[in-house]
């Protein structure tokens, strides 16, 4: 999977996600919009934890099932958290971040759209095709992965709306550079990414 040369102490145990937000689903839908400007302000780990849990965290611990629908419950989606201090792989089982690179890869995630590198956090949504049945065709794996990524992306959008964060989902990125740095082969499809940050005027 990903390169794991970073030390164990670089891993981050996230706070418990907050699920008591007073914003209703309908309000989050009403307020959802794509924004390409972000304040120069870090996202605290408690807020990040809530966004990641909403994206594809475990909401039924007894069954190990997640907040986002998943084709044949493959749970193929991986989320990489890309920040100035490095890149981390979200671990839903224990709500933690595993450091996989010490490099700031936000420019690679931004690709040709430089505004994206100004966000304090980018979430890279990847489909691990190894999770799907071997007998599935490549076309089926791609379709399932893209659909699953879409579910997760919408969860990110709604969580950011409820938490007062700006975000925008994008497909543009330097896929080759990211795969090389993260140690991902062709069984991993880098589907999309989302920038998140506080509004610039706050």
Predicted feature locations:
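N-terminal amphipathic, basic helical "cap/leader" segment at the start of enzyme domains
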Residues: 6-119
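Short, acidic Gly/Pro/Ser/Thr-rich loop/turn segments
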Residues: 21, 88, 130-132, 201
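Generic beta-structure capping elements
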Residues: 17, 126-128, 199
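Bacterial N-terminal signal peptides
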Residues: 1-3
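Short, surface-exposed helix-loop/turn micro-motifs enriched in polar/charged residues
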Residues: 71, 167-170, 186
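A glycine-rich helix N-cap at a beta->alpha junction
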Residues: 183-202
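Small-aliphatic-rich amphipathic alpha-helix that forms the alpha element of a beta-alpha
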Residues: 32, 51, 79, 121-132, ...
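Short, flexible beta-strand-to-coil junctions
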Residues: 83-85, 128-129, 196
């Amino acid at each position: 999977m990903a390169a794991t040369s970073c030390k164990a102490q670089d891993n981050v145990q996230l706070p418990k996600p907050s699920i008591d937000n007073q914003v209703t689903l309908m309000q989050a839908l009403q307020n959802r919009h794509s924004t390409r400007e972000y304040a120069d302000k870090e996202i605290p780990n408690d807020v990040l934890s809530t966004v990641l849990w909403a994206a594809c965290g475990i909401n039924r611990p007894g069954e190990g099932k997640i907040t986002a629908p998943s084709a044949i419950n493959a749970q193929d989606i991986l989320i990489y958290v890309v920040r100035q201090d490095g890149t981390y792989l979200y671990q839903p089982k224990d709500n933690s971040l595993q450091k996989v690179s010490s490099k700031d890869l936000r420019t690679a995630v931004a690709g040709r759209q430089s505004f994206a590198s100004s966000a304090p956090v980018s979430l890279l949504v990847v489909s691990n095709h190894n999770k799907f049945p071997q007998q599935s065709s490549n076309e089926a794996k791609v379709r399932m992965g893209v659909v699953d990524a879409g579910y997760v992306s919408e969860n990110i959008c709604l969580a950011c709306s409820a938490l007062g964060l700006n975000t925008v989902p994008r497909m543009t990125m330097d896929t080759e550079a990211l795969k090389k740095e993260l140690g991902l082969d062709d069984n991993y499809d880098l589907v999309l990414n989302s920038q998140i940050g506080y509004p610039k005027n706050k």
